[in-house]
Amino acid sequence: MEIKVGSIVRSKAGRDKGDFFIVLAMDDNYVYMANGELRKVDQPKKKKLKHLQGTEQVSEFIINKLSQGGKVTNSEVRKALAQAGR
């Protein structure tokens, strides 16, 4: 499963193992992700790609907002994860 901005991913390693997050930004080896609760949008978790498992789900709302240069809020991240059943 390809991981991109707006993807819902599950952590495979670390103390957040098993938790779901939304990818907010990416670079070559790392993703920056938040869940709106413990990992807030203003301090996203930096994690290596190999420590993540992609899901089939993406948040179109988050993708659209970030692509238009908007700022995503913690409540929007929580809502997107809840709508995805996570």
List PLM regions with ranges:
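Short, charged beta-turn/beta-strand-edge "cap" motif at the junction between a beta-strand
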Residues: G14-K17
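Ferredoxin-like alpha/beta domains used as RNA- or RNAP-binding modules
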Residues: M1-V5, K12, I22-R86
